[in-house]
Amino acid sequence: SGVGGELLYLPFKARWALGATINAVRQRDFNKEFGLLDYETVTAFISLFYASAFYNYDLAIHAGRYLAKDKGATIEVRRTFENGFSIGAFATFTNVSAAEYGEGSFDKGLYFQIPFNSFVSRNTKGKVATILRSLQRDGGQKLDDFTGRLWHDLRSVRYDSFEKHKLRMIPK
């Protein structure tokens, strides 16, 4: 449990943006629904985003402090298709040594999101998402969905989306 926030600076008619995220969190107890453990930390990230004109690729670099109090950066590449389906890859490198991290030496993986719009007759913001990792260790772990969420949530109103679909701007 915890509290946090995100800011996004997205200049007009730009394909890039700067973001900042900070979260103060405390670990939940494994056996109690609302119990808390003694572990507390603050995660904080500065992010640089870029929307490529090439096949709807979004690139991101997040640098900051992770849940295990390690410091480093995550590189992320995501492609979003016209129907809302997206697939991406990420790699996180931190100050945790390969010997401390163990097998795999850094956090990496693939992820995808499938919107429910493809399966239901009405418009919905629902989706199913998953992350595929070879191994998951403490190093390089972030809070899920709390870094770069604004950048991806605002995709439909970003300049790169309007530029590609100019007819959306013309009233019928």
Each model region followed by its residue ranges:
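Transmembrane beta-strand segments that form the barrel wall of outer-membrane beta-barrel proteins
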Residues: 1, 18-26, 30, 48, ...
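Outer-membrane beta-barrel domain signature
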Residues: 1, 31-37, 62-65, 99-101, ...
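Outer-membrane beta-barrel proteins
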Residues: 2-4, 9-13, 27-31, 50-57, 70-72, 81-83, 98-102, 116-122, ...
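Residues that define the transmembrane beta-barrel architecture of outer-membrane proteins
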Residues: 3, 36-44, 69-73, 104-110
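Residues on the lipid-exposed face of transmembrane beta-strands in outer-membrane beta-barrel proteins
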Residues: 5-9, 46-50, 75-79, 110-114
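Outer-envelope beta-barrel architecture signal
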Residues: 14-18, 55-59, 71, 81-85, ...
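Outer-membrane beta-barrel "beta-signal"
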Residues: 48, 105-172
